[in-house]
């Protein structure tokens, strides 16, 4: 699988994750203190990251700046997905900001799978695009 395919599929996984969080937020989660706003922020952040990963940033920005932008967006996607996975685990096994999940519904499994796919696919994209960021211009990338 090429990095370009990983980037696009990872972006779709982030979009699915955000859609699940938006659906939950628009349901009862918007009324849960702290957790509700975090679900809303996850949905917004996921949409921004997914859109950024789908855009031809390398074409719009100078080549290296585009690569760095893609790397940072991919890293952001990994961070949001890992944060959501860890938060769900904490809420399932204990409490998170006073909130605990009761059971793993189908929608939660959709979120878990999309978050895991996003991490697996976007981590290599982030690494590949951010390697040598501090190197001098024109220096060979390994």
Give names to the regions the model predicted.
Residues 1-142:
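Membrane-interface extramembranous regions
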């Amino acid at each position: 699988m090429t990095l370009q395919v990983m980037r696009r599929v990872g972006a779709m996984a982030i979009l699915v994750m955000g859609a699940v969080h938006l659906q939950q937020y628009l349901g009862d989660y918007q009324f849960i203190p702290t957790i509700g706003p975090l679900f809303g922020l996850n949905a917004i952040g996921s949409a921004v990251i997914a859109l950024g990963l789908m855009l031809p940033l390398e074409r719009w920005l100078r080549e290296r700046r585009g690569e760095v932008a893609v790397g940072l967006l991919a890293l952001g996607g990994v961070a949001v997905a890992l944060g959501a996975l860890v938060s769900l685990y904490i809420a399932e096994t204990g409490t998170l900001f006073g909130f605990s999940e009761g059971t793993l519904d189908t929608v939660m499994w959709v979120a878990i799978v999309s978050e895991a796919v996003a991490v697996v696919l976007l981590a290599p994209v982030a690494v590949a695009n951010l390697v040598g960021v501090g190197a001098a211009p024109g220096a060979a990338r390994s």
